[in-house]
Amino acid sequence: MKVFFSLKFYWTKLKNMDFNITKFQICKKDFYSRHNLGYWNNQKYLGVGPSAHSFDGITRCWNTKLHHVYIEGVNSGQKYYEVERLNTSEKFNDYVLTRLRTMWGLDYKYIAQNFGEAYVKEVSRISEKYNNYLIMENDCITLNTKGKFIADRIASEFFIVDVN
C-alpha cells in the first residue's frame, strides 16, 4: 500500500490522473485510451481476432481463444464464436464493473435513463452501506482511496440479479 500511495502522490503532483484503477492506468488530463473508453462508456465495439470480444448494445460475443479454430472458422465460414443476449440486469452489472473502477464512476442520471428507477434506488441503498469508501458528488459515485482497495467487494454488492 505504501508504494500505491507514493505513486498516487507522485502522479497527482505531476497533474496526471489515475482514470482506471484496474490496471493503475494513469494519463495526462484528456489523454485517455480511446480503445478502453468504449468499454467504460457502454458503447458498441467490435473485437477481431482470437479471444476478442464484441458488443452491439444488446448482445455480447467472444471469439474462441484457440488460434487454429479461429483461423479455420474465418476461412471456412464455420462458427468460431459464442453469443449471448444480455438482459437489463446483466447490462447494469457490466456498467458497474467497468465504470466504478474509473474516475467517472456510476452516474445516477445514466442509470435512471438506461436501467430505470428501481436500479437507482438499489444503488442508493448500497451506497449508504459503503459511504466511507465512496465519493458522492454531481449525481455520480466514485471510489475514494480506501474504496479502491476493496473495489471488487463494492462492485459485487452493486450487482443485481433481479430488482423486480
Tell me the role of every PLM-derived stretch.
Residues M1-E117, V163:
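C-terminal scaffold of the Radical SAM
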Residues N131-D139:
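A short, conserved structural fragment
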Residues K148-N164:
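Short, amphipathic alpha-helical interaction segments positioned at domain boundaries
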Residues L143-G147:
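Basic, amphipathic "hinge/linker" alpha-helix immediately C-terminal to the N-terminal HTH DNA-binding motif
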Residues G116-K129:
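Short amphipathic alpha-helical interaction segments
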Residues K29-F31, D139-T142:
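Self-splicing inteins and homing endonuclease
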